[in-house]
């Protein structure tokens, strides 16, 4: 049973998690575990914080500990399954999810993740390399000619469309001040990875001798602060942290011209001339030219519908004082995005309850 100190730390950790401060949440859960090391709930919740931070190996370890302490805790299996999927351990993930589902039948989260596992496993099984016949290879059998002939008779003359998949899968999530991008590249030496940051551009190059090079150069959803952005090459992934220029939620990683185009302030020539350069082992890119093209596109775009509404809310936030900004962030987070208030006196001392639109149902977040 958790002690009073552990319960207090657990409450603070959950509050930090809701505020998207996942690092603080993980730290508080660690302190709670030190005070009450036999509480399975704490390990399962810290696993969720680790998943948000991209620490998937640590998340699996915490989920396993929670399962050891309480073999019937369904959410511990859910955490393990989610983390194993991110680590591309789909068979392990599926086994954990199937066992957890036996304790929580009807929970759609399990069925959704199990379906994803099945799809990923099928993809891996279908990726069989096709090699050209070499000199001295055995001749095809008569049966193979018959099968090919029958297959050809049933095929349309139109050649099939083949989707070219990127070499490495990537994913991202938001925190209050950063967007964390993860590229799942296993065992890549740090010296073969080059990452360049621009104001609204990102360039990632992974070139391992003897392998096909990987290049990822998106125009980003919103502007970043290059000098505060950073990356780290780990054993199973490349983790890139993009420092947000504006504290807004990125709904995608790539720039979306129609719904999210927002005109930016023009930088004076004197300020532009003093733009710092960012070191890179790659050949120098003309970021000034790229950003000038971005600004030209944004200036020529006309806002309407959701884009105009989005600009309206950004303008309110940028012109607001500290109390108004705190009120906006607190009301938006606590109401699950259904309430936006600028009155700190009204929302500062109480929890903002969700108010879903007519015809919709508000569902609470389970930790």
Swiss-Prot record:
Gene3D superfamilies hit by this protein: 2.60.40.790, Tetratricopeptide repeat domain
Annotated CS domain residues: 165-254
Keyword annotations of the record: Cytoplasm, Nucleus, Plant defense, Repeat, TPR repeat, Ubl conjugation pathway
Gene: SGT1
Family listed: Belongs to the SGT1 family.
Pfam family, one: SGS
Protein name, as recorded: Protein SGT1 homolog
PANTHER family assigned: PROTEIN SGT1 HOMOLOG
SUPFAM superfamilies in alphabetical order: HSP20-like chaperones (SSF49764), TPR-like (SSF48452)
GO annotation, cellular component aspect: cytoplasm; nucleus
Tissue-wise expression: Expressed in roots, root tips, shoot apical meristem (SAM), young leaves, flag leaves and ears.
Native species: Oryza sativa subsp. japonica
Oligomeric and partner information: Interacts (via CS domain) with RAR1 (via CHORD 2 domain). Interacts with RAD6.
UniProt-recorded Gene Ontology molecular function terms: protein-folding chaperone binding
């Amino acid at each position: 049973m958790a002690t009073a100190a552990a319960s207090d730390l657990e409450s603070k950790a959950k509050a930090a998690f809701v505020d998207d401060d996942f690092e603080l949440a993980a730290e508080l859960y660690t302190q709670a575990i030190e005070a009450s090391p036999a509480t399975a709930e704490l390990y399962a919740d810290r696993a969720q914080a680790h998943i948000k931070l991209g620490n998937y190996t640590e998340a699996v370890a915490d989920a396993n500990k929670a399962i050891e302490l309480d073999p019937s805790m369904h959410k511990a299996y859910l955490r393990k399954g989610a983390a194993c999927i991110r680590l591309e351990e789909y068979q392990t993930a599926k086994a954990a999810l199937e066992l957890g589902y036996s304790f929580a039948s009807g929970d759609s989260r399990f069925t959704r993740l199990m379906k994803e596992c099945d799809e990923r496993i099928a993809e891996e099984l279908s990726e069989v390399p096709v090699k050209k016949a070499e000199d001295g290879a055995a001749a095809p059998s008569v049966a193979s000619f018959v099968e090919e002939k029958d297959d050809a008779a049933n095929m349309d003359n139109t050649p099939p469309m083949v989707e070219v998949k990127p070499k490495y899968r990537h994913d991202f999530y938001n925190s209050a001040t950063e967007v964390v991008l993860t590229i799942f590249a296993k065992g890549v030496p740090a010296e073969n990875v080059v990452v360049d940051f621009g104001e609204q551009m990102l360039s990632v190059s992974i070139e391992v001798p003897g392998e096909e090079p990987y290049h990822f150069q998106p125009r980003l959803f919103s502007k970043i602060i290059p000098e505060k952005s950073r990356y780290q090459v780990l054993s199973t992934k490349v983790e890139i942290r993009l420092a947000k220029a504006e504290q807004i939620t990125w709904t995608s990683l790539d720039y979306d011209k129609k719904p999210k185009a927002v005109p930016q302030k023009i930088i004076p020539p004197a300020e532009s001339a003093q733009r710092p350069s960012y070191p890179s082992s790659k050949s120098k890119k003309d970021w000034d030219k790229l950003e000038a093209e971005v600004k030209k596109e944004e200036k020529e775009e006309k806002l309407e519908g959701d884009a105009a509404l989005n600009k309206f809310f950004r303008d309110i936030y940028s012109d607001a004082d500290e109390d108004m900004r705190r009120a906006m962030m607190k009301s938006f987070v606590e109401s699950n995005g259904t309430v936006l208030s600028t009155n700190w006196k009204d929302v500062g001392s109480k929890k903002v309850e969700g108010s879903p639109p007519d015809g919709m149902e508000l569902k609470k977040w389970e930790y």
